[in-house]
Amino acid sequence: MKIGIIDSGIGGLDLLNKIINKYPNNEYLYLCDNLNVPYGIKTKKEVEKYIVNILNYLEKKHINLLIVACNTMSCFMDKLKSLYSYPIYTILDYNVKILNEKYQYDKVAIIATSLTIRSEMYLYKTNNIDIQFINGSYLTKLIEEDDETLIDKEINSLIKQINKDNKAILLGCTHYGLYKNNFISKCYSKIFVEGSKELIYDLPLKNFESKHKLEIYLTKYNKEYISLIKKHLNYNFIIHNITL
């Protein structure tokens, strides 16, 4: 099978690692719109345009299914899903599923980008959950820039904003998952919620006899960025530079 995975940047690499680990013998296409990253500080109109261009491109690549690893991109998928021939799975829907199943009537902190928060999709899709939203857009930017010192400081800053009575924390941007251990080490008394396991479980995938193939598609070729991908990705890949 040919599986597409999309993200505004490197955030989806954590999910990609987990999927390949579970189903190694498939063909994977990871499209990273690093020309326009970060999405979380853009307007809805800008991001919707980027997403439509990406989905149209993937239609031509004849993928069998698409996984939207980016929470901000996920916010636009409900109205776009029916326009394409391939099924679309979003990380946001699986985060919501876990919240609704396990945390009704609880207080939960969601750290997410500005646009994800402004979309109000987590409010719209969750039931009877008291959500504290914390804007982590700056952290997304720092992770893309690979500034480890400032990343650590910003994680500390975000954790200080979490209300003490929150039972759980959802890292509502896949970039933050790359530094989940940093969050846990600084906030070990909280439960960390994530829907990636359920998403992977639901995928209609199996392991074929052929070896896996992984291709990374960048919208801006950059040697330093390729090095950043190698830092977070556990598998060898072929790189492509594309224009959408």
Question: Where does each model-flagged region fall?
Answer:
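Non-catalytic structural scaffold of enzyme domains
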Residues: 1-244
